Amino acid sequence: MSKYTLYQGDCITKLATMQDNSVNFTLTDIPYDAVNRTSNGLRELYKGKADVLTFDLLVFLEQVYRVTSNSICIFCGKEQFSTIYDFFANKKGTVRPIIWEKTNPSPMNGQYIYLSGVEMAVWFKKSGAKVFNAHCKNTVFRHPNGRSKLHPTEKNHELLKELILDNTNEGDIVFDPCMGSGSTGVACLNTNRNFIGIELDEKYFNIAQNRIEEVANKTK
């Protein structure tokens, strides 16, 4: 049976207490711009409490690199992508851009401009890491938007499962230092992986805890 540990608080503070190479795979979606619907039905960018970066990105990356033994995948905004990519490009290992191509992109101002139908992530595998179960697979993942929308930037469940299956084996530890509403944790328990999650916002932490506990009780 999968095990899980959840922390409510600042991820940088908790990361500093974790041992080197103590998790196998870090899969996270760091805070960045989300969207809000205006009175005329169009959608505009906004920054809500759950979407604002509250920590130093380079400090965060150094800590994530330190605690992860195998591979890392970080979803991010376009403004953050080059910083994250360049950070890992200067480490020993292999870095790749990951593209989530949404099969049902949101029509945000689509009558005026091209739809924003993709999200980006940076994937990194440490030098000497052994686990990779996606042989000869490319870096484009095609899945629809997440449906439950418990969090403004929630990821598709099947997308998260696919990344977890690609980068871990059963019983491995998956880590999400910005877990939001707990989607990564749910995907871990559904694939027999162990999970460690951190969330700063109390509202989303409680949602994540309830979701993960519900799945854990069903899989006993």
Residue ranges, per PLM feature:
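Core catalytic lobe of class I
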Residues: 2-196, 205-206
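Conserved acidic E/D residue at the C-terminus of a beta-strand in Rossmann-like folds
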Residues: 199-200
